[in-house]
């Protein structure tokens, strides 16, 4: 296979990477015929990096940094982005935090200026802390009022117990209420340093021009002698057994999530696991959707989910149904999981699931924002860019035999589960569910 030269158009379009002093990485992907540009500062710190006493600090800080900098108020920041019709936002996850902007390519210098100012110079002023504390508490209350969102946090806590990935990203009303300005400032100073950061951009972007902008705005933070932090490995160990959690609530429906612990994203059978998840409950033709909804009409919403972290993961099933149908939903769900664990999926199901993964991957990367996100996550998680073509090849190499071996290995494990609905005690829950949790 010939090497790509700089004159080769394919080589010119390949993602580029520069490591600056201090360990800050800049990765870009130029997309021809795209007028927009997306840029994000990815920080390799998330909710799993907090101590239990400051649960929610990463998310609280993400809110707080937008309130003011030494040269801009929150209104100044908002008006500057509104004036160019762009988007400026952020999100916090278990293992990272991202501050990003989506603008016209010609407005990229402004976007870099704003994002860098927020990330590096957010003031954490005392008055701002109290105002934003109330905002976060309202967000927690809103999440608790949404059964599906509340159940997602309950399930991970039931599955992982005291392990950091089992704690809600948003924290709790109790932890956020007592968090101090000093704790938030300490978190910012310790973890928001260049070696923990990746600046990723995609779209109408010039790599060398972006590197120059980053040098300008990160300035004195780029101290020589530091190297990028290696991709996260995690502890590799989750103590304790999964459990069953019930929250009794007067509601029209019963909501349930149940699932198993899996290896993390670096597992050699990671894509076979993704195929298994897709065949189980990842689409309209999946086993669970067909058996629970289409054939029996027991629930409107039923699906599977796969969450992968550095050292662990969760394969789960979610369903919502009328309380009187809960036992039937659990009976059918248990039958499907037992059948797949025992007999596996078919060659046809494997092919459909692989096609769904391939199509979803490519269709989900047709804009600059999604490309930027892929660049940032790949750099933080793996320390390098993983091309779309590489991922597509990995999916294509999955065989039905590998998927079924993964199913036998994982689906016989002890399950964790969370239930939210009008049920008075765990003893009143379906026997099939209690048996799976053990």
From Swiss-Prot:
Positions with a binding annotation for Zn(2+): 59, 63, 139
Residue ranges of the TM segments: none
Listed GO MF terms: metal ion binding; metalloendopeptidase activity
Gene Ontology terms: biological process: proteolysis
Cofactors, names only: Zn(2+)
Keyword terms of this UniProt record: Hydrolase, Metal-binding, Metalloprotease, Protease, Zinc
Family that this chain belongs to: Belongs to the peptidase M16 family.
Cofactor binding remark: Binds 1 zinc ion per subunit.
Name of the molecule in the record: Uncharacterized zinc protease MT2852
One of the Pfam families matching this protein, by short name: Peptidase_M16_C
Keyword Phosphoprotein applies: no
Catalytic residue list: 62
EC number annotated for this UniProt entry: 3.4.24.-
Disulfide bonds: none
PROSITE patterns on file: INSULINASE (PS00143)
InterPro entries: Metalloenz_LuxS/M16, MPP/UQCRC_Complex, Pept_M16_N, Pept_M16_Zn_BS, Peptidase_M16_C
